[in-house]
């Protein structure tokens, strides 16, 4: 059976760290930022680490061969 292909959309959105955790950009910052708090805007600036169950799902379904 051939290898599963990596999903191109997931390749652009997620990164796997050396320890195996999955990093992604924070959500909710495309528009409507005027009503957000300054703390939210600061926190959403960088990346976040996905929760363990979500990270496992992303790797299993979308990034089977890593990056």
From Swiss-Prot:
Record-linked InterPro entries: Ribosomal_bL35 (IPR001706), Ribosomal_bL35-like (IPR021137), Ribosomal_bL35_CS (IPR018265), Ribosomal_bL35_sf (IPR037229)
GO molecular function, one term: structural constituent of ribosome
Family annotation (SUPFAM superfamilies): L35p-like
Any one biological process term the GO annotation gives: translation
Keywords: Ribonucleoprotein, Ribosomal protein
Keyword Ribosomal protein assigned: yes
GO cellular component: cytosolic large ribosomal subunit
Similarity remark: Belongs to the bacterial ribosomal protein bL35 family.
Designated name of the protein: Large ribosomal subunit protein bL35
Source organism (scientific name): Rhizobium etli (strain ATCC 51251 / DSM 11541 / JCM 21823 / NBRC 15573 / CFN 42)
Species classification: Bacteria, Pseudomonadati, Pseudomonadota, Alphaproteobacteria, Hyphomicrobiales
């Amino acid at each position: 059976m051939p290898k599963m292909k990596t999903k191109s959309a997931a390749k652009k959105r997620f990164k796997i760290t050396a320890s195996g955790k999955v990093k992604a950009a924070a959500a909710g910052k495309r528009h409507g930022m005027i009503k957000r708090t300054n703390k939210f805007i600061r926190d959403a600036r960088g990346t976040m680490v996905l929760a363990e169950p979500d990270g496992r799902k992303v790797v299993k379904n979308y990034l089977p061969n890593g990056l």
